[in-house]
Amino acid sequence: MMGKLPLGVVSPYVKMSSGGCSDPLKFYATSYCTAYGREEFKPRMGSHVGTGYKSNYRPLVSYQPHLDTLDNPAVGEQIHDTSKSVASQSYAPLEVPDGKQPLPWNLHQTTSGYGREKVNIGPLSKEVRKVHFDTQDHGPQTITGLEPKEVPLIHQQQGKGSTEWENSRYGPRFMTSEYNSKYLKESPNHPDLLLKKTIGSKEETGFTEESTKNPIVFQPPSQAYPGDPVLHPGRSITKSDYLPISHPQGNEFLPVLARGSDRDTGYSRVSERSLNPRMPTPSSQPTSMSHRSYQPPQRMQQSNVALLGRESVGNKEPTGFTLNNPSYVRSSYEQDRDQRYLTTYNQGYFENIPKGLDREGWTRGGIQPQKAGAYALSEPVTHMDTTPNPTETLRHLHPHVGRTLTSVDPFYRDVPHSNRYPTSS
């Protein structure tokens, strides 16, 4: 029979709680929902209130242009567009002409809206002529007081190209640069009918005009080898070797093979008979391409001297490419394996691991003694701790823990071979 469970002090949180939620559809019952929630609660629609930025706005009084029409029309004209933003003024909507606009008085084309507010970098010529005069249009005899300046000889500038000496000592021309006024020659407007200009043949430049007289580079056609192109200094080897593409005209001869020529290609030709009885029969194994390319010339037909036995073949000697290389010795354990791709690296840095019967001494007799590696040599000597004593261990443990260990394992306290556990005879 169970007794009454002790109850603690009721907290204010428990007093305010309405108990657990009995609705099986409410799967997620939070603490706030169980404490303050009400059944069939529906939120009321409230009014939307502006944010902090909106509440800080001052009341805006809209301006109407008709307010200053009678009282102050000048001020109304100045502030008629103050309520408009810069973006709305600059990026106005597209206006397409409908044909009701009056014709323009100016016949010249006006600039677009993008260039309307462009800042003028330099003054216009019309504005400059209102203030300054052009000494080229109005000479010194036309306007009084514009006579050439008389400078004493001592104060005259003797340097070349002085700008004060131009245009009767009035400087360069009107609105032109110094180079344009001094060194630019004006082309005549009238056509050149009297001067007959003729264009001659194209000649070589100074770099290649006299290059044929060079005795070192130049090779006359008479001294060129037969079959070799004549090397002129003015013409590169690329141009002489790679000629432009010439399309067939239709009058070329058809390709015809000569009589008695072999019509089989080098890819389909099979040598079934032995060409030279002294040479061994080629093996079925694939050989290197370099061995095929650098084979000695094979005699297709013996001459009369060879048939009489008066021809002798000497010993084969290495060429200059293989004379200085170390001699290759074929290994005894790979007699059947042909070293077709023998490189200089394999000759100099050969593999010195014994193979075959030479390797049996390493594995004969079972497991060999292990040698200390680099990791074992660098490690210090580890001292083993003494054997733990169960009696000393129980003295330092809690009594409850010690009794639990001895009850579970009776051999934990003393050594099994002690006198406490006599053996049955």
Swiss-Prot record:
The molecule here is called: Stabilizer of axonemal microtubules 4
Residue ranges annotated as compositionally biased, kind Basic and acidic residues, are 260-272
Q: Does the keyword Transmembrane apply?
A: no
Which superkingdom, per the lineage? Eukaryota
The encoding gene: Saxo4
**Positions of the region Disordered?**
259-297, 315-335
Question: What Gene Ontology molecular function terms does this protein carry?
Answer: phosphatase binding
Q: Name one GO biological process term.
A: flagellated sperm motility
Cross-referenced Pfam families: PPP1R32
**Source taxonomy lineage?**
Eukaryota, Metazoa, Chordata, Craniata, Vertebrata
Q: Which UniProt keywords apply?
A: Cell projection, Cilium, Cytoplasm, Cytoskeleton, Flagellum
Asked whether the UniProt record includes Nucleotide-binding among its keywords, one would answer no
